[in-house]
């Protein structure tokens, strides 16, 4: 068992995701894949590095995901700028041989795990994303001694859908954690009126990854407006939710 493969409720924060992330770089593309094994939620993201500072991209991505464990190839640490960023997470690093980061092997691994002939039904994944995702699930299966837990199909997060905030700015904004490391003096603590663990994790994820996609922003605002205009229904639903167990983690 590693920090990123814990699933025991008594060892996890009920309102925070326990994220393990994998990084894979191919040419000018950074592939990210992350998983919360306690819920089965599984994501990938492709980030273009063309005309961008790779160290800044890496820093902002890791700060956004706040992983408890990071899978990275040994060759990735040879870049001094990237090494300095990853060194901030040194206690969370699991370094793997570069030879394991093969996109074709990763693709086949994903097809075997999800029992599909092609990944096209799940989305249009880049080679970098596929590599990161395949490495991640292979690592999880190895740590679980071949007993792969329930994992949702991979969801692609598009680069221009969420705001990228560098690590220093995110820290100063005190979104999820204050400058002193206190979780009780943050934007999340002010906003969090959730009554379930599932809702708490969802809110924390949304605060950490602000949307920049206008249609999705308006969709969320429409839902907020509806419940603001129907206070009795809102309170009735809150009362019902209070008795709901953490189904995400129970099912996983």
Map each language-model feature to its residues.
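Charged catalytic and DNA/RNA-contacting regions of genome-maintenance
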Residues: 1-226, 239-242, 246-249
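Amphipathic, charged alpha-helical scaffolds that flank and support histidine-based chemistry
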Residues: 228-237
């Amino acid at each position: 068992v590693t920090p990123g493969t814990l699933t025991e409720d008594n060892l996890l924060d009920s309102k925070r995701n326990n994220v393990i992330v994998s990084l894979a770089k191919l040419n000018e593309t950074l592939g990210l894949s992350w998983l919360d094994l306690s819920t089965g939620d599984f994501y990938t993201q492709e980030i273009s590095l063309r005309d961008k500072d790779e160290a800044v991209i890496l820093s902002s991505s890791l700060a956004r995901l706040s992983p408890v464990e990071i899978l990275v190839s040994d060759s990735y640490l040879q870049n001094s700028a990237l090494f300095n960023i990853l060194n901030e997470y040194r206690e969370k690093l699991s370094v793997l041989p570069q030879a394991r980061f093969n996109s074709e092997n990763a693709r086949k691994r994903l097809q075997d795990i999800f029992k599909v002939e092609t990944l096209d039904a799940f989305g249009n994944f880049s080679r970098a994303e596929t590599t990161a995702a395949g490495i991640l699930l292979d690592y999880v299966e190895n740590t679980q001694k071949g007993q792969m837990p329930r994992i949702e199909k991979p969801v692609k997060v598009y680069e221009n859908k969420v705001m990228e905030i560098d690590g220093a700015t995110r820290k100063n904004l005190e979104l999820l954690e204050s400058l002193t490391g206190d979780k009780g003096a943050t934007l999340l603590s002010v906003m969090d009126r959730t009554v379930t663990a599932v809702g708490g994790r969802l809110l924390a994820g949304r605060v950490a990854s602000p949307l920049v996609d206008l249609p999705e922003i308006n969709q969320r605002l429409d839902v907020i407006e509806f419940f603001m205009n129907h206070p009795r229904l809102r309170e009735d639903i809150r009362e019902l939710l209070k008795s709901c167990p953490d189904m995400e983690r129970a099912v996983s």
